[in-house]
Amino acid sequence: MNFRYNHTPFGYKRRQTREVKVGDVKIGGNNPIVIQSMINSDTTDTKGTVKQILELERTGCEIVRFTVPSQVDADNLPSIRQELKKAGSKIPLVADIHFTPSVAMKAVEYVEKVRINPGNFADKKKFAVRDYTDSEYDEELERISAIFSPLVLRCKELGVSMRIGTNHGSLSDRIMNRYGDTPQGMVESALEFIRIAESLNYYDIVVSMKASNPQVMVQAYRMLASRFNELKMDYPLHLGVTEAGDGKDGRIKSAIGIGSLLEDGLGDTIRVSLTEDPVLEIPVARLLAEKFNKRIVKPEPVRGYSEFRNPFTYERFYSSEIKVGTFEAGENHPVRVETVLPFENSNSFLANIAKLYQYGKSFSIEPESILIDSPSPDQLKEISEAAAALSIPVGILLGKNVSLNEKLQNELRGFPKVVFDPFLQFQDGKKMLSFLQERQNAGLYTEIHTSGAKIESFKGLPETLSEIGIKNVLFSIESKEILYDYRKLGSILSQHEFPILLHGSFSNPEEALYDSAIGIGGLLIDGIGDLIRIKTPKMKDIEEIFQLSYDLLQGTRLRLTKTEYISCPSCGRTLFNLQETTARIKSRTGHLKGVKIAVMGCIVNGPGEMADADFGYVGAGPGKVHLYRGKEIVMKNVPSEVADEKLVELIKKHGLWQDVINV
């Protein structure tokens, strides 16, 4: 199988694509990454729609999308256009179409771009199970071509571009029956429509592969890029994690999916989907885009590293077990969290530990491993005595100027883990190996930690350690290029079983949130990493960083320590105030560890886009809600004023309710 989907996994180079014009905005080619969003007003409300479009334009949005669900909405587009012209707005508009080809034919007259969903443009979702023969499948493609071709020809005639936007949760029954609910199904769904467009010599196409799970979303885009390479297609990519939610969780999920793909050189335009006011999406999108619009591509090629992953599926990078008392990591254990703390004295240190435990009680999380950051050697005795009062391991990170002499090595035997840089602490390789062997003989662990600039020097070390039987070793890196350098480390360690600790050092919590989501999150969804450790310089940030570590694991779906929400960003199809409803449901259910709840504004993003949610709350009509258990409707047309309570009753009925524990 061909795993090639970008220039290289070990360095940055943007994928070359054709340029597609959306009005005066150019997507792809050598143009900067374009920022876009979607309004949530009713498209028949001219005043409200124009107001939101202008607000987004002022905030820095470059393209605006709105839903056109019916002929009535399409009929109002001339009024919207007229009012925008009066206001001096030139921002390109995108009509979002589901289910209604006839509406698309009207909308195309008044917009610069049309978005169609190949899963429902010519198909109705019936969840039917059947086997298609090849001839029956071909007949279906001919039927789709007959429905889709008129829109393609009209777009071509008017100079209107198109996004073929696949959503993981709304694949057609035909695709589902042949490929399953998979990234491959998403890719093939889009390719079917692209081929129809190409048969009509239409190429002004942008493509997207959206999912609410960043792992699925990333795999689908990579697979699409790989197929594009095979088919000699060069269409620009529109990136987005759909139904990402709100607050920090929504930003983390978006950064994991969008950011890690941009690091891979994939992506020409982005939309951050938050269940918030659309204008709040723009600063997040700008932050992500600017990282790469300003990126300097290093001229030297990356050599000496080979692909060790299957980038199209999740597979945990196998490592041997780490066991210190009751602490277990590596092997098949969940990815663990290590927290960095300073040490001034025993009292303040133990108080900080107690503070973390107290904080964690409210969120069903707790400290798992502690690392003391660069203590002075004369503090080690006091640290050891304080650590003896704890049930979790306490390790030591040696400062850069500390020499690992014999006296210090003896003092470090009181700590289950020591982190050191072999290129700073040892001048003699034999002495380093002797140090590692002595610690292993005592049942202790050592973390070999160095800068990304020195990673080449790691080559050959795993083989040496394996030859002399040293196993109690972890590897980590200090780098601003977290994704690339840890992939290099993974390549070096790919034939060995040494655990990997994902380390990120950041200047403040905001930088930590976005850069750790892109770097550490991007590695986690590839199965790389047995522990994570996030570090900022200020003690006041510790609780926030502690929470962020677990939020990253939640966002990658590797450890669910709180309720997981899948909520759409709202649009003109939404049948209730989505932000208020989501906040209300969170207030009732936010303590349900590991339960997945979808809050969806309408039937378009309902059964499908709920993905793997345990329960769903989906708008069914004005003042009416459908409640789901999985993908099955269990309560229809529930009045919205009692729907929250009925949802709680449904959760209780299925045994997933827990009473709130007051801390």
Swiss-Prot record:
Q: What is its EC number?
A: 1.17.7.3
Where does the chain bind [4Fe-4S] cluster? Answer: 568, 571, 602, 609
Give, as in the UniProt entry, the pathway in which the protein acts. Isoprenoid biosynthesis; isopentenyl diphosphate biosynthesis via DXP pathway; isopentenyl diphosphate from 1-deoxy-D-xylulose 5-phosphate: step 5/6
Q: Name one Pfam family in it.
A: GcpE
Cofactor(s) of this protein = [4Fe-4S] cluster
Catalytic reactions on record:
(2E)-4-hydroxy-3-methylbut-2-enyl diphosphate + oxidized [flavodoxin] + H2O + 2 H(+) = 2-C-methyl-D-erythritol 2,4-cyclic diphosphate + reduced [flavodoxin]
Signal sequence span is none
MF GO annotations: 4 iron, 4 sulfur cluster binding; 4-hydroxy-3-methylbut-2-en-1-yl diphosphate synthase activity (ferredoxin); 4-hydroxy-3-methylbut-2-enyl-diphosphate synthase activity (flavodoxin); iron ion binding
Full protein name: 4-hydroxy-3-methylbut-2-en-1-yl diphosphate synthase (flavodoxin)
Q: Say which species the protein is native to.
A: Leptospira borgpetersenii serovar Hardjo-bovis (strain L550)
The organism's taxonomic lineage, starting at the top: Bacteria, Pseudomonadati, Spirochaetota, Spirochaetia, Leptospirales
